[in-house]
Amino acid sequence: NQEGLFRGR
């Protein structure tokens, strides 16, 4: 999932 990268902030 790319959610983890999106929430990397």
UniProtKB/Swiss-Prot annotation:
It comes from Papio anubis (Olive baboon). Heterohexamer; disulfide linked. Contains 2 sets of 3 non-identical chains (alpha, beta and gamma). The 2 heterotrimers are in head to head conformation with the N-termini in a small central domain. The gene is FGB. Keywords: Adaptive immunity, Blood coagulation, Coiled coil, Disulfide bond, Hemostasis, Immunity, Innate immunity, Secreted. Its main location: secreted. It is found in: Secreted. GO terms for biological process: adaptive immune response; blood coagulation; innate immune response. Cleaved by the protease thrombin to yield monomers which, together with fibrinogen alpha (FGA) and fibrinogen gamma (FGG), polymerize to form an insoluble fibrin matrix. Fibrin has a major function in hemostasis as one of the primary components of blood clots. In addition, functions during the early stages of wound repair to stabilize the lesion and guide cell migration during re-epithelialization. Was originally thought to be essential for platelet aggregation, based on in vitro studies using anticoagulated blood. This is Fibrinogen beta chain.
